[in-house]
A protein has these predicted regions:
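Conserved acetyl-CoA pyrophosphate-binding loop and the N-cap/start of the following alpha-helix
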Residues: 113, 117-125
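Glycine-rich phosphate/pyrophosphate-binding loop shared by adenosine-nucleotide-utilizing enzymes
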Residues: 22-24, 82-88, 176
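Acyl-donor-binding surface of acyltransferase catalytic domains
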Residues: 1-18
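Acetyl-CoA-dependent GNAT
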Residues: 9, 54-101, 106-110, 123, ...
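Active-site acidic-Proline motif in GNAT/NAT acetyltransferases
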Residues: 107-112, 116, 144-145
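A short beta-loop-alpha structural element at the N-terminal edge
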Residues: 23-36
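Conserved GNAT acetyl-CoA-binding A-motif
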Residues: 123, 130-142
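Conserved catalytic-core motifs of GNAT/GCN5-like acyltransferases
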Residues: 139-142, 154-176
């Protein structure tokens, strides 16, 4: 399996066009992005942040992510427009163990850049990276309240494999269902 850090060196940064013609830059998150990433997450609507696994408005959470960057286990891909982060997608995977053939995708996009193809661009890049790494499956966990995200992933070939009722609680303690979606990738 090729090391992710080698793929990154050969692939990024790159430019992509949103559906409205806006040119954005895609690149890996780096240590110098700490403040910009915190500002990005603090600007996300509360209803988006409630569904995330961590409190991304806490500077300590972002600081830990930044100082523990390890592209060979988690690849954080950011979209930048005019020097501001407008999207964050991560591919989580382990090179060892019984899930070494699987990756998990996580995605957020700024509200101003939704319905312009940003999520599709970010996730498609992660799919390409996962394929390059020899991963066989990708998963995403989505609360049903994020129905637009569900349709985005469905459009990109992810299939619902489980709907777990009352399985998670958001940051305010409100119980919610969780949908698990899987996309099969070509086997190497």
């Amino acid at each position: 399996m090729e090391k992710l850090s080698e793929i990154i060196i050969n692939t990024y940064p790159k430019t992509a066009a949103l559906e409205d013609g806006t040119l954005i830059t895609l690149r890996p998150l780096v240590k110098e992005d700490e403040q910009a990433l915190l500002e990005y997450f603090q600007e996300l609507p509360l209803e988006d942040r409630l569904c995330l696994k961590e409190d991304v408005t806490d500077p300590k959470v972002i600081e830990n992510w930044i100082h523990e960057l390890d592209y060979d286990n988690v690849f954080p891909l950011i979209a930048v427009d005019g020097g501001r982060i407008i999207g964050d997608a991560t591919l989580h995977f382990s090179p060892i163990g019984w899930t070494k053939h699987q990756g998990e995708v996580r995605l957020t996009t700024s509200t101003q850049h939704r319905v312009k193809g940003l999520g599709t661009i970010l996730v498609q890049n992660l799919i390409d990276i996962a394929s390059g790494l020899g991963l066989e499956q990708l998963s995403i966990e989505i609360p049903p309240v994020l129905d637009k995200a569900f349709y985005l992933f469905e459009k990109l070939g992810f299939k619902e494999v489980a709907h777990l009722q009352g399985f998670v609680k958001d940051m305010e303690g409100k119980e919610s269902d969780l949908v698990l979606m899987i996309r099969q990738l070509s086997k190497s």
